[in-house]
Amino acid sequence: MKGTYIYKQNGIEIGRSENVITTDGKKSILQYLAGTNPDWASHMVIGSINTAATTSDKTLYYEVARSPINLKSFSSTSPNLIVKSTFEPYFAANIYEVGIYPASNSATFGVRNDLIINDFSLQSAWTDSGSAITGQWTEYLAQSPTSPRIGMYSLTVPSNKTYTNSSTYFDLRSYTTVDTLDLLLGPITTTSDPKNFTVKFTNSAGDYASLVYSLSANVNWQVKSLALTSDILNLKSISQIDITTASGLTVKIDAMKINIAAEVDETNSLVSRSIPTTPIAKIYGAPLEIEYYLDLQ
């Protein structure tokens, strides 16, 4: 079996990429063909990290959006199975990984889902001691290696600095301590390694709890993860986020999300994962169509 993703914006092809069909994916496809699995392609997903695809992949490395499959067809000539999904217009991303899941998160985990807490698209939401943050934003630019990979902006937090977002709201009551808070980070500079980066959550009652990430100098994009603690989950609903760098640490942050990937098993893990040679630009205001062609020969 082999597969190909084709990317279209406004009906025009803007790229294509070959894929790796995972070990679990082959099982899902064969079980579907045998009638023992209700579906093999339920949702298309896009992400931000271009680590090489392998047959053991169970999730994208940093999923930023998923969309239901809205068209399925069959061809008697190669390729045999064709599916299509359309991502809604109103977000921006540079896509470095793409995949297919056999089941939706809602079918597997109920109300729980990956949750993008913040992608730094709204500059006015973040302040420096109550004042607007200036000179620290990087604006989205299609396919640029320095551009945000999700959202309209990324934010550079300089040494010994706290930035605050007090106009946020999200609910943690459906999550558990096996879930993680994943940070999508760009270049990191330090005076010595490692340095602490603190994410503090506060609820409307003024109760708070923090996660402290240990960061080292790095020129590449990466994901840093820490498990949610009971103290954070006990806050229930979050109304403020503070992010703080230690002295000697400067870090670019692009997104924060809660990840439920630890609970993914072979019945709901990735069928296929692909790394485009050139990142695919998802332009704000334009839907993105992704077609997947699976050759069963």
Identify the residue ranges that each predicted region occupies:
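Small cysteine-rich, disulfide-bonded extracellular modules of the LU/uPAR three-finger superfamily
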Residues: 1-96, 101-118, 130-132, 143-153, ...
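Beta-rich carbohydrate-recognition modules and glycan-binding surfaces
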Residues: 111-263
